[in-house]
Amino acid sequence: MLQNVTPHKLPGEGNAGLLGLGPEAAAPGKRIRKPSLLYEGFESPTMASVPALQLAPANPPPPEVSNPKKPGRVTNQLQYLHKVVMKALWKHQFAWPFRQPVDAVKLGLPDYHKIIKQPMDMGTIKRRLENNYYWAASECMQDFNTMFTNCYIYNKPTDDIVLMAQTLEKIFLQKVASMPQEEQELVVTIPKNSHKKGAKLAALQGSITSAHQVPAVSSVSHTALYTPPPEIPTTVLNIPHPSVISSPLLKSLHSAGPPLLAVSAAPPAQPLAKKKGVKRKADTTTPTPTAILAPGSPASPPGSLEPKAARLPPMRRESGRPIKPPRKDLPDSQQQHQSSKKGKLSEQLKHCNGILKELLSKKHAAYAWPFYKPVDASALGLHDYHDIIKHPMDLSTVKRKMENRDYRDAQEFAADVRLMFSNCYKYNPPDHDVVAMARKLQDVFEFRYAKMPDEPLEPGPLPVSTALPPGLAKSSSESSSEESSSESSSEEEEEEDEEDEEEESESSDSEEERAHRLAELQEQLRAVHEQLAALSQGPISKPKRKREKKEKKKKRKAEKHRGRIGIDEDDKGPRAPRPLQPKKSKKAGGGGSNATTLSHPGFGTSAGSSNKLPKKAQKTAPPVLPTGYDSEEEEESRPMSYDEKRQLSLDINKLPGEKLGRVVHIIQAREPSLRDSNPEEIEIDFETLKPSTLRELERYVLSCLRKKPRKPYTIRKPVGKTKEELALEKKRELEKRLQDVSGQLNSTKKPPKKASEKTESSAQQVAVSRLSASSSSSDSSSSSSSSSSSDTSDSDSG
């Protein structure tokens, strides 16, 4: 009896899953235990029902992978889908359930084909690509879309298979974002042995379909193509695979479902541009294939893409490979021209280039992909996009501008990147997923941009610090003297040329060169005499208006904008006294640096005043010694003018290091806000100090400088208020040059020494009169002007 039962039992073993039998019966390959005689009657009805079950409907035929009647072709986009997209998905660890059609019979899913009317899997798509089944890339993308959608329709959202499908779909969308924008047909010549290869491929593809099959593997899209309510059987709840995807990812992928319905309404007449919908923030918030291709859009007719194929350059027919448009001859020459035009990136732009590479890297691709390419508003049906966004921007444009060296500095680069993000925020609602992606990417950008290295800057004006050592103050004042007036610089160049030529003449023994050199120097001497005579006669006839000018200048100082001060300076008097200071520095050695500070009004304050002071230009300097006042209190409370503050800052820098401690003590004693500051390094802003503090500083500085043997205030005198004084100083400067030229004449040749001695003695007399004139009042200065002019006439006659 037992022997008769066993053969009848075995045929039903393969259908145990469908019958709902116990796990022992369902397990394939398990030995059937011998039933006892007790249950003989129980098993006999089962035997009778086996033939009926064998009549159950089998799986429907798989989707076709080739159709001779349906024209297919090879395009650049289809080739990209085959070689790049399919290759990446096929090798993924979650791809195994999607590599072959769903075997509903084997998996015990009797309702699968009732719910899913159009099954699709990656194996079918792969074989269709290999057989050139598709006419356009949009058809292939529609098949991917169907596969993912089927999976979402049939299974519960919490099932592992759904999470696996979402992961694959995300990778699919990222890859499609980099697909060529314009679809072009590629002409492929079939080699002679293609039939053998095709047979091998068919055999290989046939073996793929016999692989292990898994339940409920379908397809992805948040907009369901089929509306029947999903009836989810409990048999699909647990899929034996270790990988589980986090729930935040699931939420992020599901969150943008409803808004994408609007995108899917894009006109289906542009299937090759549909892929761009995946790429852009304003168009598709979450990576969903609805943006790629509207569900239910008709397949592209065979002739729809013919014009684009006609644009291709002529192909070589003897090659079996798909030939791409020529990219060697023309781009090479262009690259050579571009490389010659491209300059070296600055340090900051190199950092920006690194930021750009990071934004385009795979590390951030999950939320950066919508920003890779420009928004294709027409393909995505965003008809108001360019009305709202006037200046579109994307990372590919930024990259192109960076490669073409269009960015002059890092600020221009940052402006374009921030424009891209602001466009996203402007066009999309705040709760849109693409806005969240933009914020995440912008965080990456701002974090990296904050680490921007500083460009090596030219040394600028130093802030005022009373703790600066005198040597540092000297160097800053000397740097300011280099920016003196054009007149003084030209005169200095003449003198330097003279000195250089003098050295050359000394080194040469030729008598002719010495004679020629002597003639040149005498010519220069004559020109200096003429200039001196003209200056000494000019300003004497003009009346004095010193007091009126002082009052006018005070009023104008309060009213004028800082930028107009330089104009007044040109109107009120010549820039003659400026050349005097460089001369003094040559003659006086170390003390000359203090005089140099005054050589250029705009920059002289850099060593001795606050950051505010250098912005103004000096008009005139007040009398150095404080004038008499009725009372000491009145003097202390009298506010200090800008020129006085500037002069005070210059004087402080002239003090030796041991005197600066007292300056700090005066400031800290009279200014409560600075009492806690570090005495080693204290910054003085003269605009914030009290008038009494400034007057006390002025008194102390004057007392220190008055003790010195050289008279420092004669240097400040040239910045006088009247044109007479300016002309006088110009004349003295010319006398000084005359003396220098005379010295050169002496060194050049011995015979004319008598004449040069005579000239030098007269110049020395002039120098004595200059010292006496500078220490006297304004009245005596005018008298010294006449005396110096008489000296000049003597020197001319000599």
UniProtKB/Swiss-Prot annotation:
Per UniProt, the ranges with Basic and acidic residues bias are: 315-331, 637-648
Record field: transmembrane: none
Stretches the record annotates as Disordered: 1-21, 53-72, 267-348, 455-648, 735-798
Any one of the GO CC terms: nucleus
Q: Provide the positions where the record notes the PTM Phosphoserine.
A: S36, S297, S300, S304, S631
Keyword annotations for this protein? Acetylation, Bromodomain, Chromatin regulator, Chromosome, Nucleus, Phosphoprotein, Repeat, Transcription, Transcription regulation
**SMART domains linked to this entry:** BROMO (SM00297)
Report if keyword Acetylation is assigned.
yes
**Oligomer status and interactors:** Homodimer. Interacts with E2F1. Interacts with (acetylated) STAT3; promoting STAT3 recruitment to chromatin. Interacts with CTCF; promoting BRD2 recruitment to chromatin.
Q: What is this protein called?
A: Bromodomain-containing protein 2
Q: Which organism is it from?
A: Rattus norvegicus
